[in-house]
Amino acid sequence: MSVTQYYGTGRRKTSTARVFIKAGSGVITVNDRPLDEYFGRPVARMVVRQPLELVDLVEKFDVNVTVSGGGSFGQAGAIRHGLTRALMEYDENLRSELRKAGYVTRDSREVERKKVGLRKARKRPQYSKR
């Protein structure tokens, strides 16, 4: 007996998350650890739960996530994006609601590369007139 599960890939900065959701009681597991243990900051945990809370499906699905790369907030954003895609695979009618909240769009902001002759991406060395 196979349980129907839905999949979504999410990305944010350098993080990539593979999100699997299946009918359950609302348990969220990230890299084989509970959500509260994996993310220390409450804000990161809140970001992950946002799509489920928006569509009132928090207690309906068990979420299993594999995430790699980036920092904690990048990973949280990637999980949110993947979870949104998985929910849309489950029910396409949720798309408009999730789109309105801004969860469907991939946040394309990436770190700007460092340029030759500059200290960082845009910071120039101090200018000396004389």
From Swiss-Prot:
Keywords: Ribonucleoprotein, Ribosomal protein. PROSITE patterns: RIBOSOMAL_S9. GO terms for biological process: translation. GO terms for cellular component: cytosolic small ribosomal subunit. SUPFAM superfamilies: Ribosomal protein S5 domain 2-like. One of its GO terms (molecular function) is structural constituent of ribosome. InterPro entries: Ribosomal_Su5_D2-typ_SF (IPR020568), Ribosomal_uS9 (IPR000754), Ribosomal_uS9_bac/plastid (IPR023035), Ribosomal_uS9_CS (IPR020574), Ribsml_uS5_D2-typ_fold_subgr (IPR014721). It comes from the Bacteria. Residues 116-130 have a biased composition (Basic residues). Gene3D superfamilies: 3.30.230.10. Residues 108-130 are annotated as: Disordered. Belongs to the universal ribosomal protein uS9 family. This is Small ribosomal subunit protein uS9. It comes from Cellvibrio japonicus (strain Ueda107).
